[in-house]
Amino acid sequence: MMTRESIDKRAGRRGPNLNIVLTCPECKVYPPKIVERFSEGDVVCALCGLVLSDKLVDTRSEWRTFSNDDHNGDDPSRVGEASNPLLDGNNLSTRIGKGETTDMRFTKELNKAQGKNVMDKKDNEVQAAFAKITMLCDAAELPKIVKDCAKEAYKLCHDEKTLKGKSMESIMAASILIGCRRAEVARTFKEIQSLIHVKTKEFGKTLNIMKNILRGKSEDGFLKIDTDNMSGAQNLTYIPRFCSHLGLPMQVTTSAEYTAKKCKEIKEIAGKSPITIAVVSIYLNILLFQIPITAAKVGQTLQVTEGTIKSGYKILYEHRDKLVDPQLIANGVVSLDNLPGVEKK
């Protein structure tokens, strides 16, 4: 029988071996054959079966449940459902499983009855709205941060008295738009409106009401609503998307971003909405690079009136020397002479 001393001697080790090794006091075999039996919580010698330790804590990863695991009638999950901080309930409730019974109809009826008793009615309504918000955000290809911010905004506002009488669609539309602005994801008022098909007047009123509510609740919740950022995303965030819709090259996009940055220095245009500044900056660079796209086409594609584009262009034309990257002019890429003049009244 091999002993600890004989193994150390054969390996050529010198000095005392300070390693602590659990060995079986009955077998005294080295190296020991110790087995951890997590099902019973015991540490057992594999040779003689002597229990060396009990009450063993299972340090392995928890079992998980996937969408179709319960079809076989056996659910290995021990951890339960993850809690949702957006819901009022504490998510600790009893559920009726399928089990091994053959009467599936009885099981479904029992599960339904249990759900009516345990589930909070308010949570059911909120969960239905969350599912709708998720579906709409997925349709618009919005990131998860927007979904979370929209759900938080809806949760904070949906049961307020000031929103009574407002349609569910307008509240969800306002929540998604607030979520976009909170997450600094560029989406316009009209884009969200076309996504949900809600009337402009009702949408606008609901949005203003929810803004006022959130200003008073901005310090609550796990997602703080920053009301200072709710005036609209910066105009630079719109330009790449708008240029993509128009099929413009990257050089035009970069030049339009330069123009939009410089617009902050012009008092006549600085007070305009970020969308207007973005569209007008793009239109000026379309003319600068002599791309055959009309103002009517730009307005139709980006959902801005042609009059708004032309009136904004008149302001930019007066300050054209400040709005075009001088490096492009120095390299001969563009010329200010490419910009058509504006008739003065």
Curated annotation (Swiss-Prot):
SUPFAM superfamilies: Cyclin-like, Zinc beta-ribbon. It is found in: Nucleus. Its main location: nucleus. Keywords: Metal-binding, Nucleus, Repeat, Transcription, Transcription regulation, Zinc, Zinc-finger. It holds the Pfam family Zn_Ribbon_TF. Residues 65-93 are annotated as: Disordered. General factor that plays a major role in the activation of eukaryotic genes transcribed by RNA polymerase II. Associates with TFIID-IIA (DA complex) to form TFIID-IIA-IIB (DAB-complex) which is then recognized by polymerase II. GO terms for cellular component: nucleus; transcription preinitiation complex. This is Transcription initiation factor IIB. Sequence repeats lie at residues 136-212, 242-318. Belongs to the TFIIB family. PANTHER family: TRANSCRIPTION INITIATION FACTOR IIB, TRANSCRIPTION INITIATION FACTOR IIB-RELATED. PROSITE patterns: TFIIB, ZF_TFIIB. Present with 6750 molecules/cell in log phase SD medium. Residues 65-78 have a biased composition (Basic and acidic residues). Zn(2+) binds at C24, C27, C45, C48. GO terms for biological process: DNA-templated transcription initiation; RNA polymerase II preinitiation complex assembly; transcription open complex formation at RNA polymerase II promoter; transcriptional start site selection at RNA polymerase II promoter. InterPro entries: Cyclin-like_dom (IPR013763), Cyclin-like_sf (IPR036915), TFIIB (IPR000812), TFIIB_CS (IPR023486), TFIIB_cyclin (IPR013150), Znf_TFIIB (IPR013137). GO terms for molecular function: RNA polymerase II complex binding; RNA polymerase II complex recruiting activity; RNA polymerase II general transcription initiation factor activity; TBP-class protein binding; zinc ion binding. A zinc finger (TFIIB-type) spans 20-53.
